Amino acid sequence: MLLRTNYYTLIGSLPALPRSFEQLDRVPISPLKLDERLKMLEPHDARVIDEMSNFLVWERQPLEQTDEAILRRYDKFNREVDNRFARELISHTMAIRTIFAALRCRRLQLAPPQGVAPIAAQIAKNWNHADFRLGAQYPWVIEVDRQLNGDAPFDLERMRIELAWRRLHRLAEEHYFSFDAVVLYLMRWELVYRWTQRDADVGQRKFEQLVTDAMGEFANMFG
């Protein structure tokens, strides 16, 4: 049995993450500095963090990855990571992804998507129920389905990240200086990074559009 290591120095060196999702305006520590802090991990724990980081970075690229590819990567993660807490966290992330994908498929009158068992089987069995009979465990399913009626992918991504944030924040209040606390910090940091990068990408596109518009007006002056 592996001994559980406490990481007082590591946790103490990490800047606090915001308590509220509304405060996710910037990452409190850069990826480079975070990597430096994580060098304090024991080798086995460092491997778990590496596998989690690789999976999370890979999973957040929906335009480049098919559901089948993500499931293969998820199976690989479970085979190679023996930390139960880390596996449970990634499993929950995949469950949320599967529910969102199922709601989209149903809206488009497609077949149920592949997903993580047993939730994929539950969804397929209850395909015609509004919340796939998952409402007791995931009370937000109906609201996500309602959001899909509109044309607001930004709001849907915000909801997905906020749901994950709330759960991780609750769990973080139960873990302090253990490796589990490090895992929870990484998961929450990744959400902050994803959200702030999304804002940065939007801002860059707006800036580029302003430049394009301005250049167009400039060209028209001499047209």
Question: What do these predicted ranges mean?
Answer:
Residues 1-223:
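Extended alpha-helical surfaces
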